[in-house]
Amino acid sequence: MRFVSLAVGAALLGAAGASSISSNVGLLKANGVALGNWEAAYEKASAFVSGLTTDQKLALITGSNVESTNGNFTPLYFLDGDMGLQDFYYVSAFSLSSALAMTWDRDAIYEQAKAVGSEFYNKGVQVVAGPTSQPLGRTPWGGRGVEGFGPDPYLNGLATGLTTKGYVDAGVIPGGKHFLLYEQETNRTSSFGSSGEGSPYSSNADDKTIHETYLWPFYDAVKNGAGAVMCAMTKVNGTMACENSDLLMKMLKTELGFPGMVWPDMNGQNSAKGSALGGEDYGSSSIWSTSTMESFLSNGTLSEARLNDMAIRNLIGYYYVNLDNGRQPTRQTTDVYVDVRANHSKLIRENGAKSMALLKNEGVLPLSKPRVMSIFGAHAGPIMGGPNSNVDVMGSGPTYQGHLATGSGSGMASMPYLITPYGALTNKAAQDGTVLRWVLNDTYSSGGGSSLVPSSTSSTAVEPSFENFATGSDICLVFINALAGEGADRTELYNADQDAMVNTVADNCNNTVAVVNTVGPRLLDQWIEHDNVTAVLYGSLLGQESGNSIVDLLYGDVNPSGRLVHTIAKNESDYNVGLCYTAQCNFTEGVYLDYRYFDAHNITPRYPFGHGLSYTTFHYSSLAIKAPSSITKAPKGNLTVGGPSDLWDVVGTVSARIANNGTLSGAEVPQLYLGFPDSADQPVRQLRGFDRVELSAGQEAVVTFNLRRRDISYWNVKTQQWMVAGGKYTVFVGGSSRDLRLNGTFFLWVGS
């Protein structure tokens, strides 16, 4: 949800039972976590809090100004989001996180985060409500999957960590969200009647699933400097996430060593006692009123140590990113002219092009000065009300009647402008002398006898229809999208109107290219095998430069290198997880999401996770594996910020030679997948490495993947540790989860 400051003014749900904790679990300096480079920030925060009265500490943790003998503190200002500042003028609209993940480019992910963070910093905003690791994408029907980095924990985790680091390096506090298991919009706040007692749904998952899938990316966030974490508005295993001490005090603050503050999503704080004891550190002054909290202190419900810990956690991120140095510009009202965009439009255009995946190409792309080109679909052009028209998915249809380049709710950017494909293609046609025709509608059939369309056969005018414009065109571009976002899940994974448009155009045009921008998996089987559908570009939402990014790819100014971050199935029924419509949402699929499920059940996808083509070709060879012959079963390192210190140690490497054996320069994304010994009870194979390597025609390079201890570990529910299984590991390197060109094995002997 949107945040404008540390002041929760939303209506809060009735009280519910809270988890209880032992006295010192999760408290800084009492939980056994070595703070490392957070130590100086802790000392500053602790010194400030030591001079506060109880009332001042309560003011601090409820977002009020604090004036003390130690100095003054103004409440932090929180704002969405990962795609750029909301509600401000003169800011950039970046690609959404799901698009950025499709670049599979560590540098691109980091540089965008640093650019976003710099705009927050220069606008006087202290906290980014992001990165958005979750929703992870448990179900393709989930409305907010577009805001995250995809359903693979490894890829999601690396992107989450790099984004966190980018924000920190820009001088702002990253606020990772949503913690935890928040995977759909349906019934996130709704009443279920007497059985649900007006509560949101409960996501119920076992310990192994939580650790190996949903908690995994938060390790990366914490390791890379997250100073805040937003607890979700829903329940986890029957307890509100913001009151769940197992999640917050045990897993997040102790196991992961998180030193920062936990603050609630809207409606996330349910009761004063439950949230205070459960692990929330910032709350509403109407719930944590002075009288209520002082009564908790006096009767022993809340300890002074816990209150001090809450106060310190509210400050530690501020000191960690050096916001106390006084250099940050003062925040102005949203419409005051403070232009913070720098040259970010160039970065947005480049990342947008890097992110789109070429799924199919039968030699039609790249384009070269076509004589007659027709474009079709509402997604090609602008919406009538402009790019900042409110994208409200609640009550809207499954598609957007204009070019979709940003999300909704917390995923919506403040557009300074929007380059549509129609606009960019018009400029290109003018340069090339191309005749350009268009129907910017998904269901248009004829001109209706308009007097503006002459009927004379000697005229060059053509009565506008899909059939008429497609006939005689050298190239036909059909633009389609899929809409969903905060507040509403998806109702379909394909669209009858758009699919009929593609088929109609393809029936009349032997070079039909489909351009798809979607909020999640979008089925293509209604037309993908049509003989005249000769190419498909597929991506997420690209931000203000969207049209330029797409045209750069269509004409070959950029060679496609994007890769899928989800599996595209042939049928909706191929996916194993749908939406949950009951109060209890049981994650019975465990760790088997997306390609892990498809592999386990030998389901053939239309396009696999990691797939993407290029205008050139690449050859893989020379697999080399360097792994230890033995390793301890469990990590032995100290508990640090980010978990046991040696969980992050590199314990082996895998390398392969990649050669560009085509005729054009391009970038390849080699991917490493790992198969575990049977005793680890893991999926068939899991992503455990990737790289993006740019190669000129004829050039080759050796790519090396580092295997960390955590990459070869599984969660042992009995010992409550990350453990390494002894036995045979199988290594696969290739271009997708199904395009596995090299393979090898290594054996590990595991000692105590």
Curated annotation (Swiss-Prot):
Keywords: Carbohydrate metabolism, Cellulose degradation, Glycoprotein, Glycosidase, Hydrolase, Polysaccharide degradation, Secreted, Signal. It is found in: Secreted. Glycans are attached at N187, N237, N299, N343, N441, N510, N532, N571, N586, N638, N661, N743. Pathway: Glycan metabolism; cellulose degradation. The active site is at D265. Its EC number is 3.2.1.21. SMART domains: Fn3_like. InterPro entries: Cellulose_deg_GH3, Fn3-like, Glyco_hydro_3_C, Glyco_hydro_3_C_sf, Glyco_hydro_3_N, Glyco_hydro_3_N_sf, Glycoside_hydrolase_SF, Ig-like_fold. It is an enzyme of class 3 (hydrolase). Its main location: secreted. It catalyses: Hydrolysis of terminal, non-reducing beta-D-glucosyl residues with release of beta-D-glucose. Beta-glucosidases are one of a number of cellulolytic enzymes involved in the degradation of cellulosic biomass. Catalyzes the last step releasing glucose from the inhibitory cellobiose. This is Probable beta-glucosidase D. It comes from Aspergillus flavus (strain ATCC 200026 / FGSC A1120 / IAM 13836 / NRRL 3357 / JCM 12722 / SRRC 167).
